[in-house]
Amino acid sequence: MLVVGSKRIGVQADMPLEDVTLDNADMLILPGGLGGVKGISESAHAMQLIREAYAKGIRISAICAAPTILAKAGLLKGKKCVCYPDMLEELEKAGAVVCADSAVVCDGLFITAKAAGASEEFAFAIIETLKSKAAALNVKESICAR
């Protein structure tokens, strides 16, 4: 199954969303982009998976407009987070503590990032969360990151 994003980049999916379970999940990573975010938000199965992941203590990362999915799921009340600047009001309405000046925010089970420009920092936060700070630093150094 080929999924094509808003920038016309195709990604081969391992399986259809309907077949996804959380049996071996360490983290859900929600991609940004308005079209994809709209699609995820309108999918009852995706929203159920996200709520179930949270209930099971599975970490969830979201970048760009994707933190609004977490807001729609009712999961951000009192949580520190960030998203694409044009979408911050949606997070505030959901009771989130918006950190508009941050590129990446980690709070509890959530890692949120502002936009594609924060993707390096977002990736390192994910590595640090799933592995270790040392692993994140090792990757950062090996790719000559900023």
PLM feature segments, named:
Residues 1-60, 68-72, 77-78, 90-101, ...:
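Extended, subdomain-level signal for the structured scaffold at the beginning of enzyme domains
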